[in-house]
Amino acid sequence: MDVKNSPSSLNSPVSYNCGQSILPLEPGPIYLPSSYVESRHEYSAVTFYSPAVMNYSIPNNSEDGPGRQTTSPNVLWPTPGHLSPLAIHCQSSLLYAEPQKSPWCETRSLEHTFPVNRETLKRKASGSSCASPVSSPSSKRDAHFCAVCSDYASGYHYGVWSCEGCKAFFKRSIQGHNDYICPATNQCTIDKNRRKSCQACRLRKCYEVGMVKCGSRRERCGYRIVRRQRNSDEQLHCLSKTKRNGAPMTRVKELLLSALSPEQLVLTLLEAEPPHVLMSRPSAPFTEASMMMSLTKLADKELVHMISWAKKIPGFVELSLYDQVRLLESCWLEVLMVGLMWRSIDHPGKLIFAPDLVLDRDEGKCVEGILEIFDMLLATTSRFRELKLQHKEYLCVKAMILLNSSMYPSATASQEADSGRKLTHLLNAVTDALVWVIAKSGMSSQQQSMRLANLLMLLSHVRHASNKGMEHLLNMKCKNVVPVYDLLLEMLNAHTLRSNKPLVTRSERNLAEDSESKEGSQKPQAQ
């Protein structure tokens, strides 16, 4: 028997009696009300619906899925032979741009399409709701724990469940002196037994778990919660109204992106992280050919994962295919290098290209010209290590490198303006997420500004190392030291074409200026 969710519009259940049936029950799928499916309680009696009773036609199962129709424009695309490998990789993302629809599927709330914070995930996983402050003290299942030190929570204080000790500590910190300094590395463990050992790390963790000044009383912040819910409902109403009126979908998708909070965006970037690529280390000693073969194979594998990572960034697949390819071609080596720096940040003097491919600086001497690039990578990694770069900061910085790599104009002026507006919107969202991550560290406003500036200034060093690496790869390709295939070859060819275009344009402009100057000098002589 095929059991499915009933449409949400069926609000009047018709009881079914096995002994005496008023209406004949035709054979077909049986639809189970969603209230029974989604509830966690067990019911002794369940009401069933038949499509024939409710005058609904059964979808034809001979088609591809029950009542499912794809709106994918895949049939309109040219064959892969007319597109580059990178365009084919990016083009597949459009298959998932529009969700599949079915006449028997319920309309999900928009909030389920966005990532939620860890506290919400914990509550959903445990099956208990923390939305209500009323809990039974007699049952340990309903007991809440302090989000800071994991002790038993006394209530909902400053926006989170916390104990009396952490509540009082946070109150003293926000009302008085809070310029605490960690005697260690700002990574102290804060738990029930060691929460008093370091005030700086305790305050930092208070901010990390979400403590805010306005959350001192749940009732006092009630109007903020209601107002936030009202704004969310109004935004959803505007989105549905915009869709009904046939407004451009780009505006709707921009509103969806703006609905993401910085925390949700960071969690999305965390989920989008590509997996580690394993490479077998060649037998020692290294030669120029063996090392370059290992590095180019690794880069080609990482490029495939990098395209998948880019498509998971909120709003990236909403860009045109041309813009997606242009951004990836402009920054692919920078993204790979900043990932290399993050893997090597805890290993001074070493470059962790892969978990099984670790190179020392001196091992680069076997390849002509690569030792200078190794030194640049190690120097920038050392600077990130001095700043104690955090993982969430690294996620935001890597996304900023991708979205800030647009250096070439679009085909037309209108396309240039539209793509510039979309990219600016995406870049602002990622920048807000980076600012939010730095603010959660508990530093003063001046220290936060300095840290943001230091992180952004290091991006120029990453770009410089990328330019050197690109030049070295092109030289190795021209000398036929190592064969280059697939996506890596496509990226190198795109870089060659783009770097030659400005030179041709500049030479043509110089020739035009010379001809104009000659004509201007000949006219007075003729007179």
Swiss-Prot record:
GO terms for cellular component: mitochondrion; nucleoplasm; nucleus. Residues 506-521 have a biased composition (Basic and acidic residues). The keyword Nucleus applies. It holds the Pfam family ERbeta_N. The modification Phosphoserine is found at residues 84, 102. Residues 261-495 form the NR LBD domain. GO terms for biological process: cellular response to estradiol stimulus; estrogen receptor signaling pathway; negative regulation of transcription by RNA polymerase II; positive regulation of DNA-binding transcription factor activity; positive regulation of DNA-templated transcription. Phosphorylation at Ser-84 and Ser-102 recruits NCOA1. A zinc finger (NR C4-type) spans 146-166, 182-206. It is found in: Nucleus. Residues 1-145 are annotated as: Modulating. Its main location: nucleus. Nuclear hormone receptor. Binds estrogens with an affinity similar to that of ESR1/ER-alpha, and activates expression of reporter genes containing estrogen response elements (ERE) in an estrogen-dependent manner. Composed of three domains: a modulating N-terminal domain, a DNA-binding domain and a C-terminal ligand-binding domain. Belongs to the nuclear hormone receptor family. NR3 subfamily. This is Estrogen receptor beta. It comes from Ovis aries (Sheep). The gene is ESR2.
